[in-house]
Regions:
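N-terminal nucleotide-binding beta1-loop-alpha1 segment
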Residues: 1-16
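Short phosphate-binding loop-to-helix
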Residues: 46, 52-96, 104-112
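Conserved core of the sugar-phosphate nucleotidyltransferase
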Residues: 76-81, 103-185
Length: 212
């Protein structure tokens, strides 16, 4: 079974109640729920939350809700422990993590990531981008951006992981597959500025669709 999971706790600090904050006419969480529901590859999809209001919003937008223990909703709670809690209660061979804080996904992105995972059989797959930033003064001279090879950074949009790996307490594994996305999909809402960026990008996408 391929299980999609969106963790959505209620206690976000830098941007309070961000998971249900309205973004271009819908709660932030709803954008991810809609993308998950459009997937043809997910066998089951759940939202994990301890928060009654978030649970109600998730159900309103058509998601199945799995009640999360309050002990797994604190600031120090790891994503791994949240996913392990879900796997302790639901069967799965493959886990697809879809974070509510990444609302911008091209149509079909989730299924393309799952299909890449099935074709290559890695331990884990992550979407992201190539970062070419270097610390100032870190070398004998400052390289031009085009001369820097860069390194892969995950962006929080889509993760696909072998469920057994997670059960063993690992999230990444040894064999990793990368899916490079255009920068407009790399949004990960953590604070008010991130939310503002997400709004502008989403508005632009909606205008492009309306004009097409």
């Amino acid at each position: 079974m391929i299980l999609g999971i969106t963790p959505a706790r209620g206690g976000s600090k830098r941007l309070p109640r961000k998971n249900i904050k309205p973004l271009c006419g819908k709660p932030l969480l709803a954008w991810t729920i809609e993308a998950a529901k459009a997937s043809k590859r997910l066998d089951r999809y759940v939202v994990s939350t301890e928060d009654a209001e978030i649970a109600a919003v998730a159900r309103q937008w058509g998601a199945e809700v799995l009640d999360r223990p309050a002990a797994l909703a604190g600031d120090e709670t790891t994503m791994l422990s949240v996913i392990q809690d879900v796997l302790a209660r639901l069967p799965a061979e493959i886990v697809v993590l879809l974070q509510a804080t990444s609302p911008i996904r091209d149509e079909g992105l989730i299924d393309r990531c799952i299909e890449r995972f099935l074709a290559t059989q890695p331990d884990s797959l992550a979407s992201g981008f190539i970062c070419k930033l270097t610390p100032y003064g870190s070398g004998p001279r400052q390289l031009r951006c085009q001369d820097v090879a860069g390194f892969f950074c995950d962006d929080g949009n889509v993760y696909v992981v072998q469920a057994e790996l997670i059960r063993r307490g690992d999230w990444v594994g040894a064999r990793i597959e990368q899916v490079i996305l255009d920068r407009a999909q790399n949004v990960d809402v953590d604070d008010a500025f991130d939310f503002w960026v997400a709004e502008r990008l989403m508005e632009q996408r909606q205008q492009c669709r309306a004009g097409s």
